[in-house]
From Swiss-Prot:
GO biological process: GPI anchor biosynthetic process
Protein purpose: Mannosyltransferase involved in glycosylphosphatidylinositol-anchor biosynthesis. Transfers the third mannose to Man2-GlcN-acyl-PI during GPI precursor assembly.
Record GO cellular component, one term: endoplasmic reticulum
Enzyme nomenclature, EC number: 2.4.1.-
Organism taxonomic ancestry: Eukaryota, Fungi, Dikarya, Ascomycota, Taphrinomycotina
UniProt keywords, alphabetically: Endoplasmic reticulum, Glycoprotein, Glycosyltransferase, GPI-anchor biosynthesis, Membrane, Transferase, Transmembrane, Transmembrane helix
Biological or metabolic pathway of the protein: Glycolipid biosynthesis; glycosylphosphatidylinositol-anchor biosynthesis
Family the entry assigns: Belongs to the glycosyltransferase 22 family. PIGB subfamily.
Name of the protein in question: GPI mannosyltransferase 3
Naturally occurring in which organism (per UniProt): Schizosaccharomyces pombe (strain 972 / ATCC 24843) (Fission yeast)
């Protein structure tokens, strides 16, 4: 495809990223932008994961570099530029995800399937709603799509003539690079590659007896040995360089030598502490995550599912299902291979018009869901941020009485005054006996009685209105409503019901 076409997709994803006006999950900010902001500007809120060195520095340092550029150019003083620049960068990563998914399908299934796969990627609910957000999972998915492309290109020349092994070798180096970075950012990304590395070959329709045979695995490693023989030094240098980059990145952010992958494994696997963030049914990834990732393409994905893709999904879903805490975005990196199956289904139609009709109906349904999620669901908690920014700039104090991390923080306030002048309820997992959020909702009067100096502004959800109004009145505190923001038709929890209210002290 011509370069202008890919530039158009880049512009589309930029628009997509800027068009999103809603909140999804706190990690979009507190595991990326907030960390980057703290690193560059030396103020902001660091969650326990960063004070305990449980996460890789690679992802937030990307946005830290962007913030540094804005700082040097003195563009960070513009609230519009400061809050939208990260969106444009993430939109670029989302466009690369579209490109990587297309290239993977092109090598794996051919041009017709690749064209349909790209179309599916462009109307994917997950790509439009999650892919343009600054989650580490989003960048992980982008890297995974490129990794699948390089690995499929490698398979194409596996067992080839000596003259063509140079192509296989260069593809292998590309695969090692992007897969390593994906695993550094999210160590669990290794699950995506277990089955492909052992069993995939260039023919997706290989029978199960041949696919899982010992000879298939033996031939894979025999070719890798033949390919690497005489080139081991180059592979060794690449691997060492990648590890050094990761170690140096962690050293830069944390200020000391740390190994986040060890802490990450201990917290999420051996300790079981991840369950503090909620428990899900063992079948969550099959019964909920898979349908949500595929959307309207789910029946077609299941109809065209081959053994190599099914094995890959199983190797991802099974280990994740053993952990009590589950989230949709954890398995987002498998979306490129699922979208290629949807593209394969549409390419199987003998009539292009019939395939286009099917696609149009599904795309229309996806567009409605995307519009609801990106423009209406959890809208108010983002819409209030410019107001908080302007109040902090005027040295007005405030307190957000809502579940922890309901809003972004300094990545959307960007005010040194707010560091002490504004507060929100925390929920660090090691707070005893309960975290601030629990204490507030368990016994609101007792919690509020400990406030020595009441702030200029209170922000809370409508569900808290009557109890909070009664408390303020009983204490002789006078506040009046100055703003209310619609938040969601379907609240994420009882504590988030109703509009988001802003009250000013009289």
């Amino acid at each position: 495809m011509r370069i202008w076409f890919w530039l158009a997709i880049l512009v589309f994803r930029w628009w997509n990223a800027l068009w999103v006006k809603t909140f999804f999950q706190p990690d979009e900010f507190y595991q990326s932008l907030e960390v980057a902001h703290h690193f560059i500007f030396r103020y902001g809120f660091l969650t326990w994961e960063w004070t305990s060195a449980i996460r890789s520095a690679l992802h937030p340092l990307i946005f830290a570099a962007l913030y540094r550029v804005l700082q040097v150019l003195k563009l960070d003083s513009s609230y519009f530029v400061f809050t939208n620049a990260p969106k444009l960068l993430q939109g670029t990563f989302a466009a690369i995800l579209d490109y990587g998914t297309y290239k993977f399908a092109l090598v794996r299934y051919g041009s017709k399937t690749a064209n349909w796969t790209l179309a599916c990627s462009l109307v994917s609910i997950m790509n439009a709603y999650v892919g343009v957000r600054t989650f580490s999972n989003s960048l992980e998915t982008t890297l995974t799509s490129i990794g699948f492309y390089y690995f499929s290109y490698y398979l194409k020349y596996e067992n080839s003539s000596p003259e063509q092994r140079k192509k296989a070798y260069s593809s292998l180096l590309g695969f090692i690079s992007v897969a390593a970075f994906a695993c550094f950012i999210r160590p669990t990304n290794i699950l995506v590659w277990i089955f492909p590395l052992l069993f995939w070959n260039k023919n997706p329709q290989t029978p199960i007896k041949d696919l899982l045979s010992f000879s298939n695995v033996f031939n894979r490693f025999r070719f890798l040995y033949a390919l690497g023989y005489g080139r081991l030094f180059g592979i060794f240098v690449l691997c060492v360089s990648l590890f050094l980059v990761n170690i140096i990145a962690d050293r830069i952010l944390y200020g000391r030598f740390v190994f986040p992958i060890i802490s990450f494994f201990q917290f999420n696997v051996t300790s079981g502490l991840s369950s503090l963030y909620g428990l899900n049914a063992w079948h969550y990834y099959l019964s909920q995550a898979l349908p949500l990732i595929c959307g309207g393409f789910l029946p077609f994905v299941l109809l065209t599912m081959d053994l190599q893709t099914a094995g890959t999904i199983l190797c991802v879903f099974f280990p994740y299902s053993l952990i009590g805490h589950k989230e949709l975005r954890f398995v987002y990196p498998i979306s490129p291979i699922l979208l290629t199956l949807a593209g394969k289904f549409f390419s199987s139609f003998s009539s292009w018009k019939r395939a286009a009709r099917f696609f149009f109906l599904i795309g229309l349904g996806h567009a409605l869901v995307i519009t609801f999620l990106c423009r209406f669901h959890q809208f108010g908690v983002m819409e209030v941020m410019p107001l908080i920014h302007s109040l902090a700039e005027k040295n007005q104090t405030g307190l957000i009485l809502a579940p922890c991390h309901t809003t972004p923080w300094q990545s959307h306030i960007h005010s040194p005054f707010a560091e002490n002048g504004w507060k929100f309820l925390t929920c660090e997992p090691f707070e005893k006996p309960f975290d601030e959020t629990d204490r507030f909702y368990e016994n609101m009067p007792t919690f509020l009685d400990k406030i020595k100096e009441w702030p200029d502004y209170l922000i809370f959800f409508e569900e808290r209105f009557y109890s909070l109004y009664s408390y303020l009145d009983s204490r002789g505190l006078k506040y009046e409503e100055v703003q209310r923001y619609y938040n969601s038709l379907i609240p994420e929890s009882r504590e988030r019901a109703g509009a988001l209210l802003v009250y000013k002290k009289l």
